[in-house]
Amino acid sequence: MEKYVVVLAAGKGTRMKTKLYKVLHQVCGKAMVEHVVDAARAVKPSKIVTIVGHGAEDVEKVLAGKSEFVMQEEQLGTGHAVMQAEGQLAALEGATLVVTGDTPLFTSETFEKLFAYHEEEGNAATVLTAEAPDPFGYGRIIRDDQGNVLRIVEQKDGKPEELKVKEINTGVFCFDNQDLWVALKQVGNDNSQGEYYLTDVLEILRKAGKKVGAYKMPDFSESLGVNDRIALAEATRIMQRRINEGHMRDGVTFIDPATAYIDADVEIGNDTVIEGGVTIKGHTVIGSDCLITSGSRIVDSQIGNGVTVTSSTIEESIMEDNTDIGPNSHLRPKALIKRGAHLGNFVEVKKAEIGENTKVGHLTYVGDATLGKDINVGCGVIFSNFDGVKKFHTTVGDKSFIGAGSTLVSPINVADHAFIAADSTITKDVGKYEMAIARGRQVNKKDYWHKLPLSEDEEWK
């Protein structure tokens, strides 16, 4: 059976009170509609068609290469939205799944089971349903004695006995593709909203003698639709729990999973420990046997094996195996920390390479620089890389020593085995085995204390 997917993503979402197109609001680092499309792609459909409207260009950019797109110029209901895909799907044989782009929690497993059930039962239409703890506000699924779906009753229209039903419509449907397009031509807009409803297709098919069934999924929470910021927060909470539990099943330890925020595309190796209050975002990859402590934030970075990150921020950077950083340090974009290097507290590195086994202990800024291996950088060292107009680069060779409080004014080259005395301001190259001293000589003024002025109530002692 060929599979097709239609994603409805044309609504504006006024209840979100936002300038951002609703389905582009993120849940754990991915737009809601991208979660939906990625789940659909996992069932390997022959086509995915996304119906776009408001913010179409932005949606197409997010889903580039993952879907075809059709514009719905006027938003005239769910049935009207599906009709826009006629040119892409109407001539095809198979089954079509219809899902909205603001339901980010549906899994590929649920879609796969819906397709399979639809095919096994020989249905013309299959409604994805769930048992709701509190079904108020949802459309209720009314079945006949054989379990076939008779109708979907909305809250405002239901009789008392119908409203006792807890099986609800999730808004996801699977149709025989040919039956769908025949029925859509019969859907009218004779209702208070003047819209074309996709749910009318079910009644049209049933009256035509076609079989309409329902597949009840076990997890009601998957069906959460996001229409406001409260629902967005709830979807994020559920997705975060799902992500963290997945990592834990793969061998990652979470000290307090409820407070660890991990984006959907993050990868973490086994035997790594994530403490509470950690944020890991984007396409970050973390190796095995690492420790990420409270207060750390890692974005779009690669962390090797055996790395310790202590209450630090890492952005678009690489830390190789057996390195450590922190507390309270910051890797800015394009920092490369090579194997065995140590960065202590209050160290900032930007667009710089720190070589193997090099130590940068504390209170240091390294920007636009390449440091070799086995270097010791003392406390309070500054790589002065900016003249107010341009950035300049400095290179420090292997096994060099940079004394505390020194400033290296770029661009300069410090050779292998060079020494820079503490509190020096270095403006010229330093050769191999040389020691550079660039500071004023110390002068001790004898009896200077006695030359200081006294207040009226003081005397020299």
From Swiss-Prot:
Binding positions (UDP-N-acetyl-alpha-D-glucosamine): 8-11, 22, 72, 77-78, 139, 154, 169, 227, 332, 350, 365, 376
Cofactor(s) for this UniProt protein: Mg(2+)
Annotated EC: 2.7.7.23, 2.3.1.157
Magnesium keyword on record: yes
UniProt GO molecular function: glucosamine-1-phosphate N-acetyltransferase activity; magnesium ion binding; UDP-N-acetylglucosamine diphosphorylase activity
Comment on bound cofactor: Binds 1 Mg(2+) ion per subunit.
Family: In the N-terminal section; belongs to the N-acetylglucosamine-1-phosphate uridyltransferase family. In the C-terminal section; belongs to the transferase hexapeptide repeat family.
Protein name: Bifunctional protein GlmU
Organism the protein comes from: Lactobacillus delbrueckii subsp. bulgaricus (strain ATCC BAA-365 / Lb-18)
Gene assigned in the entry: glmU
